[in-house]
Regions:
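Adenosine-phosphate binding glycine-rich loop
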Residues: 37, 49-62, 78-82, 90, ...
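Rossmann-like NAD(P)-binding element
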Residues: 156-159, 163, 286-340
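Glycine/serine-rich phosphate-binding loop and adjoining beta1-alpha1 elements at the start
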Residues: 37-78, 112-116, 122-243, 435
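Short internal beta-strands
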Residues: 106-117, 269-271
């Protein structure tokens, strides 16, 4: 049974309730006139010590974020503000939430993907007084309930990861009446925001974190590249050297995945729809061909696009027996899992995190992490130091929104001064000096 926390006056009470009852508790009248409010919903509050150990570990290495906490504590921009976060809920994101809380804000958080929720980390946040609504493997209906729970208190700023909170705020404008802006983390989310802006539907200012150089050059490329292969190797216990890897998409994420696969000794094939990226990948030393031609050749297929059903059943039917399918784009719809399930004669769990599908021709196809984000659903996510950069950008942009006059609706880039501040802070904590103009040395 999940653990539910309630506030009543100054006290917090934890109760274990049947799961089906938890979603009737967002607003309860107690004795007719006293409102009882749900503070958190996690799988098991007793997991908190395990989660706290993980948070304490990443805190040691998120040195840029720690420096910015000290910097932003001076002007009290975060004090008495309400901040909502919808982001993959694991130790590094939890530490961001706690930094925001330490700066004086009240924090609500849920996971942007139910398969990426780490229940022990959610429990640790609840113990710290963060309003967390997240359970690993929750249904889509439950996920939508969690989204409502983090915005019903009308936040001043939002951190989004994929655009789902932004969509909800537009369906319920009253939730956004205090909103000064949104910080969007991902390629997928920024694309959704730009479409809304082009259609004239975007009501709020939004900063596209993903378009900052301090984000895509490091998080998207090096972070995803390393974490994707760490997860694939952990899940499969297979050797990568000598395998043929098909990377679907050659944006910054695809570049990182292909680069790390090459470094591990794999032969890499890239598939693309963008002619410039296709030529770039060829110049980088990779074979380039359509997915259908690559399908019979690949041992491991990794989708990196953020687009729906890029790896379809007609591709999967051409694959060799023993092929592995993994997704490291944002959502869990890049691989046509529904089509695979309908077509396969038989499906079973082959190993934790791996499903085996027996195709009509007898071939075995292996799906990793249910088609969700393999690096998070099947691993620990990006390296700590990489997310230190990305979350420093988030914190810097939240501070910018809270300390500035409200911007007009639209999609804004990360201000250059914030982007540069973050990367210079990283150079400082790593003890790296660089040349300035003339004889100046910057350290």
């Amino acid at each position: 049974m999940p653990s539910v926390g309630f506030s009543f006056g100054e006290s917090i009470y934890n109760r274990n309730l049947p799961k089906e009852d938890c979603f009737n508790l967002l607003e309860i009248n107690f004795k007719g006139d006293i409102k009882l409010t749900q503070d958190f919903l996690v799988k098991d509050i007793n997991l908190a010590p395990e989660g706290q150990l993980k948070i304490d570990w990443v805190a040691k290495w998120m040195k840029v974020l720690n420096r910015l906490q000290k910097k932003f504590s001076i002007d009290n921009s975060f004090k008495n503000k309400r901040v909502a976060l919808c982001i993959h809920l694991e130790a590094k994101t939890a530490y961001l939430a706690l930094i925001i809380q330490k700066l004086g804000s009240e924090v609500w958080i849920t996971s942007s993907n139910t398969l990426s929720t780490k229940d022990e980390v959610a429990a640790a946040l609840a113990k710290k007084g963060v309003h967390v609504f997240a359970i690993h493997g929750a249904s889509q209906q439950e996920y939508r309930s969690y989204l409502r729970s983090i915005v019903e208190n009308k936040p001043h700023v939002v951190v989004d990861d994929g655009g789902d909170v932004c969509e909800l705020l537009h369906r319920h404008p009253d939730y956004g009446e205090n909103l000064k802006g949104i910080c969007e983390e991902t390629t997928t989310g920024v694309a959704r925001l730009k479409l809304m802006a082009e259609d004239g539907r975007l009501r709020y200012p939004a900063i596209g974190i993903n378009d900052a150089k301090s984000k895509y050059l490091f998080d998207n490329r090096y972070g995803t590249g390393q974490s994707t292969w760490t997860a694939i190797m952990h899940l499969t216990n297979m050797n990568i050297a000598g395998k043929t890897v098909v990377v679907i998409g050659y944006g910054w994420v695809g570049r990182g995945v292909a680069l790390r696969a090459k470094g591990l000794g794999a032969e890499v094939i890239v598939t693309e729809i963008d002619p410039w990226k296709a030529l770039e990948s060829r110049m980088d030393g990779f074979k380039v061909m359509p997915i259908l031609k690559a399908a019979p050749l690949g041992d491991i297929f990794v989708t990196t696009t953020g687009l729906e059903n890029v790896l379809r059943i007609e591709h999967i039917e051409q694959m060799k027996s023993g092929a592995f399918l993994a997704n490291t784009g944002h959502f869990d719809f890049e691989i046509d899992v529904k089509g695979l399930s309908r077509t396969a004669h038989y499906m079973k769990e082959a190993r934790e995190g791996i499903e085996e599908f027996t195709m009509p021709n007898g071939n075995k196809i292996y799906l990793l992490a249910q088609g969700g984000l393999v690096n998070i659903a099947g691993g620990l996510g990006h390296p700590v130091e990489i997310m230190d950069l990305s979350f420093a950008l988030q914190l810097g942009c939240l501070h910018y929104l809270l300390s500035s006059e409200k911007l007009a609706p639209g999609v804004y880039p990360v201000p250059d001064e914030i982007d540069e501040m973050v990367v210079r802070e990283k150079l400082k904590v790593d003890g790296i000096e660089i040349d300035g103009f003339g004889k100046e040395v910057i350290g």
